[in-house]
UniProtKB/Swiss-Prot annotation:
Keywords: ATP-binding, Isoprene biosynthesis, Kinase, Nucleotide-binding, Transferase
Protein name, as recorded: 4-diphosphocytidyl-2-C-methyl-D-erythritol kinase
One annotated GO biological process: terpenoid biosynthetic process
First-tier enzyme category under EC: transferase
Pathway, per record: Isoprenoid biosynthesis; isopentenyl diphosphate biosynthesis via DXP pathway; isopentenyl diphosphate from 1-deoxy-D-xylulose 5-phosphate: step 3/6
Organism in which the protein naturally occurs: Vibrio campbellii (strain ATCC BAA-1116)
Reaction equations catalysed: 4-CDP-2-C-methyl-D-erythritol + ATP = 4-CDP-2-C-methyl-D-erythritol 2-phosphate + ADP + H(+)
Length: 290
């Protein structure tokens, strides 16, 4: 066990496009989507110990410990690896919950990757992704740490290298239930499947966007405003929307025009996750037990 206090990023992600191609017999939606990380997110400070207990601070209001995805990830790793170590985890939370940018899934993946290193359980990315999939469909993307083209019901991942553009990400003050969007009778479910090269050279669309804009006027209003300045769309099922720019200064110029009451940030796309880069830094710095 490595008992140093270590800091780990928990980055946000964007769905640069999202197409719904059909439905499986058991009701899941078949889709094609492109995940890219951004250099903005939460941070976990983790101190491994031999208590066997997982403690997290501060508590997330309205979320009992055993419903916290970080706790679920840590205890799932303990069980999978038959590990008796524990940890105290401090969460610095800046990503919104339920925003479509992967906040909870990213937290779970960061816990898995960090504790696998600190506890020296030596599980592979495939094994960590298997644990993560039981926690949430997006967790494996964060575990693997590369931008990915996802197909099927989201389980088929292949590396992708979209341009690392600058993004202005805005969160309208609404909470959107994914089930409500995927269950809506008017949702497009028959977009033809295309290969990644074709999709990268086609204007990007999110098939959920039309329904979300219809049901949530705040999202529609924010997207209409962003579209005046740059290509913009919904990420996931929302509520976050984003505009893409070729430079940081362009994105920050538009950010400055937003009301102080609007939650927003500027970030750059990253095809290698900041989490993966941090793991490599710790591994190369010879943080080893004495």
């Amino acid at each position: 066990m490595i008992d140093l206090s270590t800091r780990w990023p928990s980055p946000a992600k964007l769905n640069l496009f999202l197409y719904i191609n059909g439905r499986t017999e058991n009701g899941y939606h078949e889709l094609q989507t492109l995940f890219q990380f951004v250099d903005h997110g939460d941070e976990l400070t983790i101190q491994a110990n031999d208590s066997g207990e997982i403690t997290i601070s501060p508590e997330i209001e309205g979320v009992p410990l055993k419903d916290n995805l970080i706790w679920k990830a840590a205890t799932a790793l303990q069980r999978f690896a038959n590990c008796s170590y524990g940890a105290h985890i401090d969460l610095h939370k800046i990503l919104p919950m339920g925003g479509g940018i992967g906040g909870g899934s990213s937290n779970a993946a960061t816990a898995l990757v960090a504790l696998n290193y600190l506890w020296q359980t030596n599980l592979s990315d495939d094994e960590l992704a298997e644990i993560g999939l039981a926690l949430g469909a997006d967790v494996p993307v964060f575990v693997r740490g590369f931008s990915a083209f996802a197909e099927g019901v989201g389980e088929k991942l292949s590396p992708a290298h979209p341009d690392e553009k600058w993004y202005l990400v805005v969160r309208p003050n609404v909470s959107i239930a994914t089930a409500d969007i995927f269950g809506h009778p008017d949702l497009t479910r028959n977009t033809p499947k295309r290969d990644l090269e074709t999709l990268l050279n086609t204007p990007s669309v999110n098939d959920c966007e039309k329904i979300v804009r219809m049901l949530y006027p705040e999202v529609d209003k924010q997207l209409s405003w962003l579209l005046q300045y740059a290509p913009s769309r919904l990420t996931g099922t929302g509520s976050c929307v984003f505009a893409e720019f070729s430079s940081k200064s362009e994105a920050e110029t538009i950010l400055a025009q937003l009301s102080d009451k609007v939650s927003a940030f500027v970030a750059q796309g990253r095809n290698i996750s900041p989490l993966k880069e941090t793991l490599a830094e710790y591994q190369s710095a010879s943080h080893r037990p004495i």
